Structures are given as structure tokens and as C-alpha cells.
Amino acid sequence: KYAVATDNCTDALLMCCEYLGAKEVTIPSRTYLSVPQSILHSGATLKFRDYRWKGMYQLEPYPIYDAAKRLTSGMYIPGSFMCLSFHIKKHLKIGKGGMILTDSEEATQWFRKARYEGRSEVMYHEDNIEINGWNAYMSPEQAARGLMLMQNYPDHVEDMPEEPFYRDLREFDLFKNVEVI
């Protein structure tokens, strides 16, 4: 129902964790490095689960999905916050960019402000800043490229493989003490 463009999928995940006040988040131990970092930046505790995923996975127990490797019709899960990536290596090769899909109007309004330094899409001297936001909006140039690419995007697309598969994040010193459940 709603789509909020961001500068990348990582910041989309961070904003979703912040919006929901995430306390403890469980993700696969093999995923992209910035995902657990975004969880830690949100102030949540991180846990790993050892399983192989395809296309997307949930940031458990929250209705947040990392869908960086999936972009196809009918993929949205009602009541969720689905985070997309438009990196040059992903389906929609904008170069840089991300998006949050949701059916929540309230969350959409919060994400729009959060991605834009906490302000509405007006000059900041004409606004009242109520939330602490980020400089995480998609540039107009990237948005224009994305709109152009969407004109010829197919309805049904297979999930992107990751070969070789992601490195086990527990091999990094930063994550060596993360509990595995």
C-alpha cells in the first residue's frame, strides 16, 4: 500500500528497528555484514540462528523482513515492514537505494520524516522537528533512474542467489560473542 524510498536497505532495516523499538532481534548467522550492524546501531540485542535462507528472511520476532534478494509481484506480507535493496548487484539496479514497503499509514509518515533528518519534506525553517532522524533519503537522481527501470521490470522474478553464500558472521571478532539459538 505504501512505499518509502531510502538511501539503502541497511538504513531501511535500522529505521524499522527504531520505529518498532526492537529489543532483541534474531537473524541468520549468514547474511550481509551491515544487517547485524544496523540492529546493533538501533540499540537492540543481536542473536543468530544457523539456517540457510533464500530471497528474504524475518528479523525475528518483529514483522521486519530483509528482502534485499527478492523483488517480485505478490511478495508483500500484510502487516509487515519489508525492506528492499536497489544496489547495483540487486534486481532493480539503480546503483544505490532502498525502500520500505508497509500497509501502515502511521509508520509511513514516521519513516518519511525519519529518513529526512526528522523533518517533513519542506524547508527546515518552516518545519517543527519532532523526531531525531537520519540523512537517509534516496537522491532524486536515483529515484528517477528507479522509475525509469520499473517501466520494463517483469512481474515475476526469481530470488537472487548468493554464490558463494554469505560468510558466517560469527567468524568476525565483532560478532564472536553473539548467542546462537
Language-model segment annotations:
Residues 2:
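Gly/Ser/Thr-rich phosphate-binding loops and adjoining beta-strand/alpha-helix segments
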Residues 5, 27-28, 100:
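Conserved SAM-binding loop
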Residues 11-12, 31-33, 68-70, 88-91, ...:
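Short, solvent-exposed loop/turn segments at secondary-structure junctions
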Residues 11-14, 81-82:
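Phosphate-group recognition and catalysis centered on beta-loop-alpha active-site segments
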Residues 14-74:
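PLP-dependent aminotransferase-like
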Residues 71-73, 80-83:
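Extended catalytic core of nucleotide-activated donor transferases of GT-like folds
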Residues 81-181:
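Active-site region of PLP-dependent enzymes
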